[in-house]
């Protein structure tokens, strides 16, 4: 069973979101990094670029696959994690900490995100299909 921190929100595309006021930190979940395998490359957008919810904003490449990362909310990139660009293995080692990907600012509260319990049910349902 994946580690699913209860203080975070989640998407069905396996991104996590930590909201703090009008900003949000985004990364991929432990489940996603485990499915991908060893991450070898992370591509993130420039600071200042805006994205709509559901729009791809970067990619994570592993030894098994290349996966797009989707914006869990509409907003502007205010910071990217250059550490993860330089050391992509951080996504595997600490997906909810040092392996975060980007910070967004937003003006409209995000909607459609899953609670930890809802995300756990979702990944269990997906595993049983």
Curated annotation (Swiss-Prot):
Modification N6-lipoyllysine occurs at: 64
Domain Lipoyl-binding, first and last residues per copy: 23-105
Signal peptide region: none
Cofactor(s) this protein cannot do without: (R)-lipoate
Cofactor: binding comment: Binds 1 lipoyl cofactor covalently.
UniProt cross-references to CDD domains, sorted A to Z: GCS_H (cd06848)
UniProtKB keywords: Lipoyl
Gene3D superfamilies reported in the protein's UniProt record: 2.40.50.100
Pfam families assigned to the protein according to its UniProt record, in alphabetical order: GCV_H (PF01597)
UniProt-listed GO biological process terms: glycine decarboxylation via glycine cleavage system
Protein purpose: The glycine cleavage system catalyzes the degradation of glycine. The H protein shuttles the methylamine group of glycine from the P protein to the T protein.
Quaternary context: The glycine cleavage system is composed of four proteins: P, T, L and H.
Family: Belongs to the GcvH family.
Descriptive protein name: Glycine cleavage system H protein
Species name: Herpetosiphon aurantiacus (strain ATCC 23779 / DSM 785 / 114-95)
Lineage summary: Bacteria, Bacillati, Chloroflexota, Chloroflexia, Herpetosiphonales
Gene from which this protein is expressed: gcvH
């Amino acid at each position: 069973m994946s580690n699913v921190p209860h203080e975070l929100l989640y998407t069905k595309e396996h991104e996590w979101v930590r909201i703090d006021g009008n900003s949000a930190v985004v990364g991929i979940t432990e489940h996603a990094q485990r499915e991908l395998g060893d991450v070898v490359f992370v591509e993130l957008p420039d600071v200042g670029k805006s994205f709509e919810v559901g729009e791809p904003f970067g990619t994570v490449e592993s030894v098994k696959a290349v996966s797009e990362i989707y914006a869990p909310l509409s907003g502007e990139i205010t910071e990217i994690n250059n550490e993860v660009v330089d050391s992509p293995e951080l996504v595997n080692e600490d997906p909810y900490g040092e392996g975060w990907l980007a910070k967004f600012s937003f003006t409209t509260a995000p909607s459609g995100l899953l609670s930890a319990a809802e995300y756990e049910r979702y990944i269990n349902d997906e595993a049983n299909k």
